[in-house]
């Protein structure tokens, strides 16, 4: 019985050591002064099924978590967040569009492709906070790893 409990404990703790470290926009603004890195912003909503799927598959992949933690600044951004965000010397606000419905201005700024926003959105910024890539679709762990490899070059 003790061996079984030990095995279960080790199984849970060995996978728990690697966690994806998400930053805020404000943190990244400050961190860029000390170490320049590309910023990967995952723009999602709570109701988006593909967004939730990426959270439990792509962003739980150990290799992906390690690459994101060491080579990039990662921001997990809910497009329906209702607080103001100061980023790149500009304040972005939540824009209500009905009863308990709306979208954050920063999500629109970073996630709009061809005049529309479709979730999930992956937005990559260079170290000067300029958009270098936008992608609005589900990315499997395999495809996301390929993207990270290209971004690391």
Regions found by a protein language model. Name each.
Residues 1-21:
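Bacterial Sec-dependent N-terminal signal peptides
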Residues 19-35:
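N-terminal leader/targeting and pre-domain segments
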Residues 34-49:
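Short active-site neighborhood of thiol/selenol oxidoreductases, capturing the structured segment around
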Residues 35-39, 70-73, 127:
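Loop/turn elements at helix/coil->beta-strand transitions in domains of secreted/extracellular proteins
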Residues 46-53, 121-123:
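C-type cytochrome heme c attachment motif
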Residues 52-67:
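Typically the conserved alpha-helix immediately C-terminal to a functionally engaged Cys/Sec
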Residues 63-64, 73-121, 125-131, 151:
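Thioredoxin-like thiol-disulfide oxidoreductase module
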């Amino acid at each position: 019985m003790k061996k079984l409990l030990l095995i279960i404990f080790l199984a849970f703790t060995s996978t728990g050591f690697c966690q994806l470290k998400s930053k805020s926009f404000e943190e990244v603004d400050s961190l860029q002064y000390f170490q320049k890195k590309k910023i990967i912003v995952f723009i999602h909503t709570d109701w988006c099924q593909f967004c939730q799927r990426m959270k439990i598959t792509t962003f739980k992949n150990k290799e992906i978590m390690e690459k994101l933690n060491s080579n990039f600044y990662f921001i997990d951004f809910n497009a329906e967040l209702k607080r103001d965000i100061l980023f790149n010397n500009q304040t972005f606000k939540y824009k209500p569009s009905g009863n308990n419905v709306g979208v954050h201005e920063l999500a629109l700024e970073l996630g709009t492709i061809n005049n529309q926003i479709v979730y999930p959105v992956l937005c990559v910024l260079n170290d000067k906070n300029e958009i270098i890539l936008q992608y609005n679709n589900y990315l499997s762990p395999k495809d996301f790893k390929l993207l990270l490899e290209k971004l690391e070059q």
